[in-house]
């Protein structure tokens, strides 16, 4: 779910990935007008904005991990008029970034309360700080020059498992309490790939003795 429920609609983003089960089905099989049987949303990842609250929030996402963050950020900034949000978002390049236009629009709407930090792994940038992947080393580097991680009341992390594990460890090391760090894991194991295996067996003669007989 990638939009705030306050808009009265439910929008779901699906990014097809190599070996993905549902993502490939959604891309190739689901068509406009189809009726789908769905369950209620699962898990406890998210945040319920409170109009009277003034908070500082952090989101760390990579790739399609931006999906729940967009809903959380837009709902929080719309409801909590004095709260601030920082998004650290990792992608291969600006062209591969999901919701690039939506994020730009959100930044234009809340220029003083939303900070966007984009990290690109396959795009040449003037600053080495913004080049590479989001990992523990990158977050510690950001802490030295650009981001005060101790200021945040809540942190939300979503993306590849390795990134999430390193980000969680880095935030703890940088002073954030564990209870303030929330993770969303939605990856599933890839579909097993069938392989043809050739086995070459050399003939061997074996004598088996049972009850004294060969």
Ranges and model annotations:
Residues 11, 37, 58, 84-88, ...:
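A structural signal for isolated positions on well-ordered beta-strands in alpha/beta enzyme cores
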Residues 1-35, 39, 52-55, 83, ...:
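Ferredoxin-reductase
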Residues 57-67:
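Short, glycine-rich nucleotide/cofactor-binding loops
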Residues 95-214:
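Reductase modules of NAD(P)H-dependent flavoproteins
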Residues 40-45:
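Short, charged beta-turn/beta-strand-edge "cap" motif at the junction between a beta-strand
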Residues 9, 54-57, 77-85, 107, ...:
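A short alpha->loop->secondary-structure connector
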């Amino acid at each position: 779910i990638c939009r705030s429920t306050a808009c009265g609609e439910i929008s779901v983003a699906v990014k097809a990935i190599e070996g993905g089960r549902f993502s490939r089905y959604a891309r190739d099989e689901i068509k406009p007008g189809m009726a789908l049987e769905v369950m209620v949303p699962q898990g406890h990842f998210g945040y319920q904005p409170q109009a009277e609250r003034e908070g500082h929030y952090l989101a760390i996402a990579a790739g399609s991990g931006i999906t729940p963050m967009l809903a959380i950020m837009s709902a929080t900034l719309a409801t909590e008029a004095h709260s601030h949000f920082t998004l650290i978002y990792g992608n291969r390049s600006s062209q591969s970034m999901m919701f690039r236009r939506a994020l730009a629009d959100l930044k234009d709407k809340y220029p003083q309360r939303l900070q966007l930090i984009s990290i690109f792994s396959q795009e040449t940038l003037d600053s080495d700080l913004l080049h590479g992947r989001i990992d523990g080393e990158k977050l510690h580097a950001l802490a030295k020059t650009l981001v005060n991680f101790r200021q945040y009341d809540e942190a939300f992390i979503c993306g590849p498992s390795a990134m999430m594990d390193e980000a969680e460890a880095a935030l703890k090391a940088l002073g954030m309490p564990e209870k303030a760090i929330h993770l969303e894991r939605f990856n599933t194991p890839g579909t097993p790939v069938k392989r043809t295996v050739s086995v070459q067996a050399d003939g061997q003669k074996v004598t088996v003795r049972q009850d004294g007989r060969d």
